[in-house]
Amino acid sequence: MFSSPLLLTTALCATGVLSHSPNSYHFDPLRHLAGVAPPFDPIDPPLDPAPPQGCNVTRAAYLVRHAAIFANDFDYETYIEPFTDKLKNTTVDWTKVPVLSFLATWQDPITDAEQEMLTRSGKLQATKLGVDIAQRYQSLRTPKKIWTSTAERTVKSAKSLTHGLADDESDISVVQIQEGEEDGANSLTPYKSCPAYSSSAGSDQSSEFLEVYTKPALGRFNAAAPAFNFTATDIYGMSLICGYETVIRGSSPFCNLELLTPNEWLGFEYANDIQYHYNTGIRIEKLNE
């Protein structure tokens, strides 16, 4: 058998793009956005990926997520779109609300058609990951196949990966695996392989904390712009936009620390922790008992 990296793709994430000096720490909301945070290496300096002295890599397998998308459909339809629709219909003069004055000219970076689609930066992430893998395992043969689920964002991530992995991407076949109930190949999307899984698990617990951590921000915003009637889900949607817009446009005015405090960003992060703790973490068994 020859040595070759086996690449299993449900979605791709790239190596870190955010960093800070340990001697000049500055709170960065982009590091506290849970699943919508742009990729970064949490360890400074990053760990050396080389094997221990005296060891050699003879085979490598990668199971990775898709690269950056415009927006998760649930996030967009539940939080972002209701907030942006509310913005379109409001009569508030944002130029008279200092911390929110950018809303007078701000435009939504996401459309309905772009939901779940791969962004340009996402394609770059996937390509860079391919380059990183090729350079890291130069002694291994380039794989002939990459397996992917059939979601468009995943297929495009896999194809972008081949651009960086091989000198000629046509040397690698991107194989789409059907995941229907009759096909049985559902390991690339774990929740489809577990009949007991519930996508709503954790929502109640997370929503309860959402009402708690957003209270200070609601007090400030509704005092500044009472006609808009900010809600807890508006605050959550603004935090989501910070991450998604940064990936799409390179930056976002919603990431401003004058808009939300570090504690409020940490509240957003913890609300997501609660959601996933009960949804796919160790507490899932307790909910199913």
PLM features per residue range, with description:
Residues 1-21:
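Fungal secretory targeting signals
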Residues 20-142, 152-289:
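Signature for phosphate-centric chemistry
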Residues 145-149:
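Short glycine-rich or small-residue beta-strand-to-loop segments that form or flank ligand, phosphate
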